[in-house]
Amino acid sequence: MTQQEYRSPSQRLSKGRSMSLPKIFARNLRSLQNNAPPGKNINVNCLNVNSCSLSASPSSQINMACNGNKQDLPIPFPLHVECNDSWSSSKLNKFKSMFNHNRSKSSGTTDASTSEKGTHKREPRSTIHTELLQSSIIGEPNVHSTTSSTLIPNEAICSTPNEISGSSSPDAELFTFDMPTDPSSFHTPSSPSYIAKDSRNLSNGSLNDINENEELQNFHRKISENGSASPLANLSLSNSPIDSPRKNSETRKDQIPMNITPRLRRAASEPFNTAKDGLMREDYIALKQPPSLGDIVEPRRSRRLRTKSFGNKFQDITVEPQSFEKIRLLGQGDVGKVYLVRERDTNQIFALKVLNKHEMIKRKKIKRVLTEQEILATSDHPFIVTLYHSFQTKDYLYLCMEYCMGGEFFRALQTRKSKCIAEEDAKFYASEVVAALEYLHLLGFIYRDLKPENILLHQSGHVMLSDFDLSIQATGSKKPTMKDSTYLDTKICSDGFRTNSFVGTEEYLAPEVIRGNGHTAAVDWWTLGILIYEMLFGCTPFKGDNSNETFSNILTKDVKFPHDKEVSKNCKDLIKKLLNKNEAKRLGSKSGAADIKRHPFFKKVQWSFLRNQDPPLIPALNDNGCELPFILSCNKHPKRNSVSEQETKMFCEKVANDDEIDEADPFHDFNSMSLTKKDHNILTYSENYTYGKILYKATCTRPRHNSSHRSFFKDIIPEL
């Protein structure tokens, strides 16, 4: 290059390196301008993704607005050049050969210095109004799988490519070059689609410092690793504004010129779908990440509670004895008492069972209370009382259970003068007891203490089993099996398990318990027969004057039915089969509750809808009972005696944490816990009600065709 020739700073920096296609294009435009006939204008229109319009004046001035970056030139494709006046064919051929020569030299690693005809004088820059024209992706590749890319000189940006202002010479020659669309050909360094650079990441000086071949090699290596083809593989590029999918945009319609910065985009190093793939990858990573711990509120559980089978139902204790206010005494036994209490925070009422640790150790009943807690915590049945809280202090154990307003079923029977109920009503209560016993047997527990005193009446009138201190868990139980399709064999859960404990109420004891030969789950079906008999006739079948006579009657005498009350044959047959002295032949000893349900006595019972049926008796609060505010006022000023001081101590002690209890403590396995699930059906305290004696209202819609007592619900005693 001669000394008279002007060289820009970027050209000096690029000495010895390959020239990019934008520089070649700019140099050829200058050469084209120098060879233009005097007095003629050449308009160059570059239509691509980032296109602009360059006006070449007769004075060989190329005015470009690049916003301070002379190297930010548009990508010269699609490219088409025409003249507005007649040119000689030799000049056009010379320009064409010069352009192809420089384009072929740009693929090498070095650029030989070439001379350009004419003297370039640096003129002041002027703003070029450019317009962003969207290139159409509508095109039909030819047989050579190439896309024709042309640059069209026009007088107006938005004019049709085929229109040429002024007269066009017939010997004007169309200059075109082809850009490959085959993905396999993208490795060619001379491909113009790989030479464009992104002006956002490049400066004037760094544009020529990037090695083109290294970037192309890295790009194709990434493509081969990812197994993805070039984003331009199936696209056809066209410079026609008519075919543009955005030809109806406001900018094109109104032809408003805009001053924009031409952007150089390196398609090889930054494919069109890179940003989209990055977003999809981020979304995929976000989906794979686990939820944060702050989104999940896990209830606290002690180490011992987490090892229990019912650990998921409960959490660490949330109450203490001071959280409850005593209302009245519901009952008492040899080792504890049951109180009606009100929780201060929620205003809900519960039945709180308080057990004395010293008395339990003295009477060797530690294992019983542990079994009772396990059964209550494990059970989830509508006919078994619900345990809400259990905790212990230094001297007491506490079981906070659901309060059954109807009290003991035995008391409901005692409100009748005849002390009995009709057969249809007895069938209803017996059905619910069978469902509860079946559930316990499926869990592997034997109840062993079924009697009217341990059956409570819910506020809805349905029965609920309680007092599981005499229950036992069968060891080595098996899984239940299906027999006769719809019937479940529940006896198999405790098959082979026998115990020699002499427990239960003497009038309800089974013959095998009295003999001491050991007993199985069949003892519960014996007690069911005694219960049905007592509901129908008001007494037990083998009651004697003393315990020895009662045991003798159980072992030797058969069941007899009074003649003053009529019962169905199916009812008598059921009682006889349940009170069979031979355990192996007793009804329910083979298939458990399935044998009981198949009996004709329960033929019309809808076992799946027991909870939805109307109970015979509905407990109601009696207006003649003691008022609750008076009871509370008495509790605020108790009498100073040993009993009141002991009760006061029960509600003032501090709860012991599970992990703080020594393993040598006999009550180490008694868990302090609260039910996790909130129950919104719990009775709430109200000053408008009295929590004294209970009346049992009859449901008159129930059929009682076989009952000899026509005035069944007319002789109810108003008080307990």
From Swiss-Prot:
EC number in record: 2.7.11.1
Q: Where is this region: Disordered?
A: 1-20, 99-128, 230-257
- Catalysed reactions listed for this entry: L-seryl-[protein] + ATP = O-phospho-L-seryl-[protein] + ADP + H(+); L-threonyl-[protein] + ATP = O-phospho-L-threonyl-[protein] + ADP + H(+)
Keyword presence, Phosphoprotein: yes
Q: Where is the composition biased (Basic and acidic residues)?
A: 244-255
Q: Which InterPro entries match?
A: Kinase-like_dom_sf (IPR011009), Prot_kinase_dom (IPR000719), Ser/Thr_kinase_AS (IPR008271)
Q: Per the record, what phenotype accompanies loss of this gene's function?
A: Simultaneous knockout of FPK1 leads to decreased phosphatidylcholine and glucosylceramide transport into the cell.
Q: Which residue intervals are annotated with compositional bias (Polar residues) in the record?
A: 1-13, 99-116
Q: Where is the Protein kinase domain?
A: 324-602
Task: Tell me where in this chain the PTM Phosphoserine is found.
Answer: 203
What processes does the entry annotate via GO biological process terms? phospholipid translocation; response to pheromone triggering conjugation with cellular fusion
Q: Where does ATP bind?
A: 330-338, 353
Q: Which CDD domains match?
A: STKc_phototropin_like
Which residue ranges have biased composition labelled Low complexity?
230-241
Q: Which Pfam families does the entry mention? A: Pkinase
| PANTHER family associated with the record | FLIPPASE KINASE 1-RELATED
**What is the recorded name of this protein?**
Serine/threonine-protein kinase KIN82
The organism named in the record is: Saccharomyces cerevisiae (strain ATCC 204508 / S288c)
